[in-house]
Amino acid sequence: MTMRSAVFKAAAAPAGGNPEQRLDYERAAALGGPEDEPGAAEAHFLPRHRKLKEPGPPLASSQGGSPAPSPAGCGGKGRGLLLPAGAAPGQQEESWGGSVPLPCPPPATKQAGIGGEPAAAGAGCSPRPKYQAVLPIQTGSLVAAAKEPTPWAGDKGGAASPAATASDPAGPPPLPLPGPPPLAPTATAGTLAASEGRWKSMRKSPLGGGGGSGASSQAACLKQILLLQLDLIEQQQQQLQAKEKEIEELKSERDTLLARIERMERRMQLVKKDNEKERHKLFQGYETEEREETELSEKIKLECQPELSETSQTLPPKPFSCGRSGKGHKRKSPFGSTERKTPVKKLAPEFSKVKTKTPKHSPIKEEPCGSLSETVCKRELRSQETPEKPRSSVDTPPRLSTPQKGPSTHPKEKAFSSEIEDLPYLSTTEMYLCRWHQPPPSPLPLRESSPKKEETVARCLMPSSVAGETSVLAVPSWRDHSVEPLRDPNPSDLLENLDDSVFSKRHAKLELDEKRRKRWDIQRIREQRILQRLQLRMYKKKGIQESEPEVTSFFPEPDDVESLMITPFLPVVAFGRPLPKLTPQNFELPWLDERSRCRLEIQKKQTPHRTCRK
């Protein structure tokens, strides 16, 4: 700051004064006067790195005090060079500086370094140049020059300055590189400290100056930076805390999932062990059942051989019936579970041979069976004694077990055909899974028979081709209801007021009732929907699966089996009932005679066709 202010003040000196006044300005600038001078505020900063022009010859006067001519012939645009007053002859101190604009002095003023003679107007010299290169002077040399008076501008016969008298014949030395101004070693400590402080404050200040405004703005910037850093730290801390919470939650979920997986693995292992045990038990049960079946077939073969030689009509009860029923009674529970495993096709011809020996109408009660309980026989007797028509299907099992006796020399096909013809329902020899639902025998019928009156029901006797007996066909009769004629209508009663007001009054109450019912229905429907939504939410939160409805069937369960029937003929069952066997017949109605049918046919034949008309 000291060097720049010296340059500015030296440049701002009035151009119209004498050289002594100019020296006073230069001394004041070298001593570092106050900065609030009027010339300092108007000065501008010099660029640090500006290439200097070659200096002209030193400003020196001859012994006689004549002014030295400029090298360019005192051109109008030449530049002069001011050298320090205390410099040694033939030497140029290292300094930095630049060009400073100077006001153009009038032609009558005196030049620096020239004896007190004014410049002649007609000597060919132009007025003072517009720009002048100024090199800053060292502080110590300026102080010494200020103390000792130099004969800058004396009388005509005075001695000139040593810098002006001594000139380098080889030419001017090279200029130094631009940079910060070096301080003289002879400078005082106060001057050094002041210059360094000003230089540092000027270099560090953000606004390019060492004033108080720069320090305040710098402090405000630092405060804002600190606040921003604190906000950033708080935000990062919050993010870290949130991430830590998420990590803890994920760890807890992972632990719970691992625990569930372990439980599921344990359950799967237990289920596998249980399945293996059940399979082992089932395989053992199948083996024992197959052994029992083979033993049963062998016993049946041995028992059937002596029966074929007998010719009596009555079947001896003990050999086959007791053995079959006894074994069947003991094996009731496993036979129901392994119904598909029984070799029915192998035993069918043997059973047919045995059945040909039994009489046609022998009931079950005549068989002396020691293994069967008495309760089963009583139930079957009660079911046979019931006079109800649909109970005839209960009577069919004894007929199946006791077919007509025939000679043993008949082939198997003839025996099968005869047995199939005797059955009152459709049957097949192809084995398939079917369920014949028969209600259990009970003392009281499930459906009470309606009282039948001969007066209201007409009976038609039709020959039955199945059993050779007459069957009764119930046909409903027509009833005559006597209707009394109406009395004579009264014209006053028939008239009815159908005005809008009367109609609205009559129907207003009904409409209100209907609206109330509708509102009530809508409210109930809304409540049901809300309840369903709440249940769904609860099931989703708790993970409870909705209970699926149990699939039930109208067929009885296999645990309710009371008796077994082995036969090669399976009934054709539909909806749990066997289909009746119907012989092909023409459809006839009993109340229509031949004459009425002929009339209908004639009328149909006489009707002309509309398509034949043209």
Curated annotation (Swiss-Prot):
Keywords: Acetylation, Chromatin regulator, Coiled coil, Isopeptide bond, Nucleus, Phosphoprotein, Ubl conjugation. Sumoylated with SUMO1. The modification N6-acetyllysine is found at residue 353. Residues 272-281, 294-304, 376-392 have a biased composition (Basic and acidic residues). GO terms for molecular function: protein-macromolecule adaptor activity. Residues 158-169, 185-194 have a biased composition (Low complexity). It holds the Pfam family MSL1_dimer. The keyword Cytoplasm does not apply. Residues 1-127, 147-217, 272-420 are annotated as: Disordered. Residues 550-591 are annotated as: Sufficient for interaction with MSL3 MRG domain. GO terms for cellular component: MSL complex; nuclear speck; nucleoplasm; nucleus. Induction: Up-regulated by gamma-irradiation. A motif (Nuclear localization signal) lies at residues 317-346. Residues 223-237 are annotated as: Interaction with MSL2. Residues 170-184 have a biased composition (Pro residues). The coiled coil is formed by helices from two subunits in the MSL1 homodimer. Belongs to the msl-1 family. Component of a multisubunit histone acetyltransferase complex (MSL) at least composed of the KAT8/MOF/MYST1, MSL1/hampin, MSL2 and MSL3. Forms a MSL heterotetrameric core with MSL2. Interacts (via PEHE domain) with KAT8 (via HAT domain) and MSL3 (via MRG domain); both interactions are direct. Directly interacts with NUPR1. Interacts with TP53BP1; this interaction may be required for MSL1 DNA repair activity, but not for histone acetyltransferase activity. Interacts with TTC4, ECM2 and PIHD1. This is Male-specific lethal 1 homolog. It comes from Homo sapiens (Human).
